[in-house]
UniProtKB/Swiss-Prot annotation:
Protein name: L-lactate dehydrogenase
Source species: Corynebacterium glutamicum (strain ATCC 13032 / DSM 20300 / JCM 1318 / BCRC 11384 / CCUG 27702 / LMG 3730 / NBRC 12168 / NCIMB 10025 / NRRL B-2784 / 534)
Entries under HAMAP family matching the protein: Lactate_dehydrog
Listed InterPro entries: L-lactate/malate_DH, L-lactate_DH, L-lactate_DH_AS, Lactate/malate_DH_C, Lactate/malate_DH_N, Lactate_DH/Glyco_Ohase_4_C, NAD(P)-bd_dom_sf
GO (cellular component) term, any one: cytoplasm
């Protein structure tokens, strides 16, 4: 597997998510050069100025510039946050069709530059669009990664931490499957400060109802945030920064992302949310969790939901 070099990142799409990612990236000092591409040139110019002025106070020497696709040639990563939002009355398939076409155009321009790094995709529906980027790019599957369930898992860990009054970093639990309505929590392998959640359930049958409510709040959080402020941005921006750090610092850590399956969970030829070990080469390996029969049934439903959409386009 090829290992990328340097710490230059090209960000495509400077909407709420893209700018939140850029802000997190600068504050964590991960990129030497962040080149940003967006169709709204005037707004992009303002964001680049604003971000550069903040670099003074960050533990960072990141240089932020208005980018072009030529910047992709020597980039270690291209991060895609661009895409169309769903309009009133527009079906999900219509939205997917529109965004698949956008991905085809973006990826074509990126690959024409001679890019040979790692794609990180955040545009929704992320699992389908990550598959599209992989197909259009012609790169090895391990070098095309989607944000997947990184945000869903973070939300779940945060809410479990609130329930048990422990830091989210002491909660180890994953949301897997589609980044969307068919995702599922893996309660069977979850731990709170080292204590198995399954063991807690055995001792307290009423806990099951509270956990189901936490999962529903996790799954539906985006709807509430969008209703309140128009979009989600900070959580996913920080999640993308976490994946970026795992890649650029060659960390070999397991992160919940959208990855191509090759027989894991009995599935293949589909990008879907699952833990994967990530390093400078992209995805080193997909982690297949040991899940219960009920969890497997829900995962299969999630995979089939994605496949039904995917086959309309590929």
């Amino acid at each position: 597997m090829k290992e990328t070099v340097g710490n230059k990142i090209v960000l495509i799409g400077a909407g709420d998510v893209g700018v939140a990612y850029a802000y997190a990236l600068i504050n964590q000092g991960m990129a030497d050069h962040l080149a940003i591409i967006d169709i709204d040139e005037k707004k992009l110019e303002g964001n680049v100025m604003d971000l550069n002025h903040g670099v003074v106070w960050a533990d960072s020497r990141t240089r932020v510039t208005k980018g072009t696709y030529a910047d992709c040639e020597d980039a270690a990563m291209v991060v895609i946050c661009a895409g169309a939002a769903q309009k009133p009355g527009e079906t999900r398939l219509q939205l997917v069709d529109k965004n698949v076409k956008i991905m085809k155009s973006i990826v074509g321009d990126v690959m024409d530059s001679g890019f040979d790094g790692i794609f990180l995709v955040a545009s929704n529906p992320v699992d389908i669009l990550t598959y599209a980027v992989w197909k259009f790019s012609g790169l090895e599957w391990n070098r095309v990664i989607g944000s997947g369930t990184v945000l869903d898992s973070a939300r779940f860990r945060y809410m479990l931490g609130e329930l048990y009054e422990v830091a989210p970093s002491s909660v180890h639990a994953y949301i897997i499957g589609e980044h969307g309505d068919t995702e599922l929590p893996v309660l069977s392998s979850a731990t709170i400060a080292g204590v198995s959640l399954s063991r807690m359930l055995d001792k307290d049958p009423e806990l099951e109802g509270r956990l189901e409510k936490i999962f529903e709040d996790t799954r539906d959080a985006a709807y509430h945030i969008i209703d309140a402020k128009g979009s989600t941005s900070y959580g996913i921006g920080m999640g993308l920064a976490r994946i970026t750090r795992a890649i650029l610092q060659n960390q070999d850590v397991a992160v919940p992302v959208s990855a191509l399956l090759h027989g894991e969970y009995g599935e293949e030829d589909i990008y879907i949310g699952t833990p994967a070990v990530v390093n400078r080469r992209g995805i080193r390996r997909v982690v297949e969790l040991e899940i219960t029969d009920h969890e497997m049934e829900r995962f299969k439903h999630s995979a089939n939901t994605l496949r039904e959409i995917q086959k309309q386009f590929f």
